[in-house]
Amino acid sequence: MADGEDIQPLVCDNGTGMVKAGFAGDDAPRAVFPSIVGRPRHTGVMVGMGQKDAYVGDEAQSKRGILTLKYPIEHGIVSNWDDMEKIWHHTFYNELRVAPEEHPVLLTEAPLNPKANREKMTQIMFETFNTPAMYVAIQAVLSLYASGRTTGIVLDSGDGVSHTVPIYEGYALPHAILRLDLAGRDLTDYLMKILTERGYSFTTSAEREIVRDVKEKLAYIALDYEQEMETANTSSSVEKSYELPDGQVITIGGERFRCPEVLFQPSLVGMEAAGIHETTYNSIMKCDVDIRKDLYGNIVLSGGTTMFPGIADRMSKEITALAPSSMKIKVVAPPERKYSVWIGGSILASLSTFQQMWIAKAEYDESGPSIVHRKCF
């Protein structure tokens, strides 16, 4: 690796809903934009308009009326590599304005990411972007680093997927990782559905963005769902109003806590899965009996879907009910948890001890994409 002190590694956390990118050593990502690639539905008729064949991120979002929008990452795992390449290109050249061939790049991956996917990421970085060095880190492990721990269980819930990942002394325990295909996007969909019951109709992809904003601004998690339902039905204390972009004002009441309740009761959206509290408990129970105490005492929340007010108290209450009665339970909800994966990456990539961990271009040229399994674990 080039031994210039001034070369800052790049950190890129590719989520299902948002890309978080920036420079190692910074305390927050410089660029945060939607993981969307949009292509025009119709060919341009105006000469000289300079229509692009694809738009990425916010630009795709703002032109969504004339585009077909695609998310290249589904449930946390890359499913469309051509579009993913466009997103990385946009990240480096338009958002961060850097030449990737001059910086080591740290990428993140979902837990239980297929082996072929890690190899493909590695290949694209070295062959398309000519990076001097790269590394692939597991998202949940980075969140734990960001909270200043090396042992604990992370509940990482984003837009497309949720995971519970037990980590011991810095290593994820793959046999105990559990995945739940229930996350932010499902909650937005559910809110769209229950708002329809109130007589408000939200159907298009543009309207989904409005509902997502309602969710982010007004939803919260009830400590006692039944009791909260009682309150909502008998008084207007939980009602709030929200102004739509066209000036119309809507009122939202019980929907505020009914929406994120799905995390604890997936049966509300017809899913057979266990809720996030049970999934966390099941994950802990798959671990060695000797380390469970450390896991119960370090339950760390991460990702945008854990941003609901009231989530830590409810989580604590639910897990206390499942765990052995003498067990000390601590749920940690760091205020910056929306970006804690990125922050953990920023910390890791700037550690002096990490510098020998990078996969260098020379090593890749010698061994090919499979080098990633030997160097990143």
UniProtKB/Swiss-Prot annotation:
N-acetylalanine PTM positions: A2
Keyword presence, Transport: no
InterPro entries, per database record: Actin, Actin/actin-like_CS, Actin_CS, ATPase_NBD
Its EC number(s): 3.6.4.-
SMART domains attached to this UniProt entry: ACTIN (SM00268)
Reaction(s) the record says it catalyses: ATP + H2O = ADP + phosphate + H(+)
Other information: There are 8 actin genes in A.thaliana.
Protein name listed in UniProt: Actin-11
